[in-house]
């Protein structure tokens, strides 16, 4: 422990004395950025048969308690995770991430089974073994890849790769002649469980492709793949081309329908606006008409005023009588104002005309 503490102190001193980007150190008041050594993030993980291992050095497996507490930098905990990794997806990456983070100092070794083993024990794969090796190599959490990994882990394989723990989800993985291929690993105390990611798996991806096979076949035919490459018969090829043309016609009809709906909607909006404006103008017109020609309109008042003025002009006002009980005696003759002479007597014809005019004036007054 003392040696480990002294190594940490020396490492801190080296970090402080390390020059910064401009040649300055932390002691000069300018914090320096130490570049991390992240080979796994810059290059693909190496294959196990390309790494030279010094088997002369003794190897002692660490316990779970020691691994959880932390190990020295030169002695990482070697964790092994295996699988098929066909159509490498986020579920695979999450499982490897969990295996990498099981302990503070972990060296993750990933085994990938060959095509022969996989086809015999599990079934046909979409990707061949080289494609699957390459996919796992480029996962950021992987430190080493084992090609042609065994289906069942043997003590010799564990010793050869100096494996401390095996990481896998704790669901029993059955195989030919065994209910759980990790049973002996669990009994030896070397099993480190991880959690399976729900909703994503290679089988689910293949199911989606099979379910929508016609869609993907038509898409690849459009992109230049031949019917022979897609293993599509002549009749199905013509059917897919016909469906594609029908879909194009449907799309055009749908576009026209949408545009016509938009046009009709705009026309309706415009018509509603015009109707509203027409109603407003009609109300204004009716109101103006009633104000002018209605029962109490301005025209009737004008006619009444004109009629009254005409009546005043035609018949002047009579002077009040001297006595209300005394009746005025008809004058025998008409006298011109400002003259002392009496007018001559009226002829019978003139007298009848005067009576008729007086009768008309009296009728107008009664009206």
From Swiss-Prot:
Q: How the protein is affected by changing residue 240 to H?
A: Decreased solubility
At which residues is N-acetylmethionine found?
1
Where are the residues of the annotated region Amphipathic?
228-287, 298-315
| Composition skew (Low complexity), residue ranges | 319-339
Q: What is its main location?
A: cytoplasm
Naming one, the record's GO cellular component terms include: nucleus
The UniProt keywords, alphabetically, are: Acetylation, Cone-rod dystrophy, Congenital generalized lipodystrophy, Cytoplasm, Diabetes mellitus, Disease variant, Dwarfism, Endoplasmic reticulum, Lipid biosynthesis, Lipid metabolism, Membrane, Nucleotidyltransferase, Nucleus, Phospholipid biosynthesis, Phospholipid metabolism, Phosphoprotein, Repeat, Transferase, Ubl conjugation
The subcellular localization recorded is: Cytoplasm, Cytosol; Membrane; Endoplasmic reticulum membrane; Nucleus
Region Disordered, as annotated, extends over 1-33, 313-367
Sequence segments annotated as region (Autoinhibitory (AI)): 272-293
Q: What is the effect of changing residue 223 to S?
A: In SMDCRD; no effect on solubility; decreased lipid vesicle-dependent choline-phosphate cytidylyltransferase activity; 4-fold decreased Vmax; 3.5-fold decreased affinity for phosphocholine; 3-fold decreased affinity for CTP
PTM summary from the entry reads: The serine residues of the C-terminus are phosphorylated. The inactive soluble form is stabilized by phosphorylation, the active membrane bound form is promoted by anionic lipids or diacylglycerol, and is stabilized by dephosphorylation.
Task: Indicate whether Phosphoprotein appears among the record's keywords.
Answer: yes
Q: Which residues carry this modification: Phosphothreonine?
A: 325, 342
Q: Which GO terms describe its biological process?
A: B cell proliferation; CDP-choline pathway; isotype switching; phosphatidylcholine biosynthetic process
UniProt catalytic activity: phosphocholine + CTP + H(+) = CDP-choline + diphosphate
Documented effect of changing residue 37 to S: Abolishes formation of the interchain disulfide that can be observed when the enzyme is treated with copper phenanthrolene (in vitro)
The residues listed in the UniProt record as binding phosphocholine, with positions renumbered to this chain, are: 122, 151
| Sites of Phosphoserine modification | 233, 315, 319, 321-323, 329, 331, 333, 343, 347, 352, 362
Q: Which Gene3D superfamilies match?
A: HUPs
What disease is this chain connected with? Spondylometaphyseal dysplasia with cone-rod dystrophy: An autosomal recessive disorder characterized by postnatal growth deficiency resulting in profound short stature, rhizomelia with bowing of the lower extremities, platyspondyly with anterior vertebral protrusions, progressive metaphyseal irregularity and cupping with shortened tubular bones, and early-onset progressive visual impairment associated with a pigmentary maculopathy and electroretinographic evidence of cone-rod dysfunction. Lipodystrophy, congenital generalized, 5: A form of congenital generalized lipodystrophy, a metabolic disorder characterized by a near complete absence of adipose tissue, extreme insulin resistance, hypertriglyceridemia, hepatic steatosis and diabetes mellitus. CGL5 is an autosomal recessive form with onset in early childhood. Affected individuals also have short stature.
How does the record describe its quaternary structure? Homodimer.
Protein's name in the database:
Choline-phosphate cytidylyltransferase A
Q: Write down the species.
A: Homo sapiens
Query: In the UniProt record, what gene is named as encoding this protein?
Result: PCYT1A
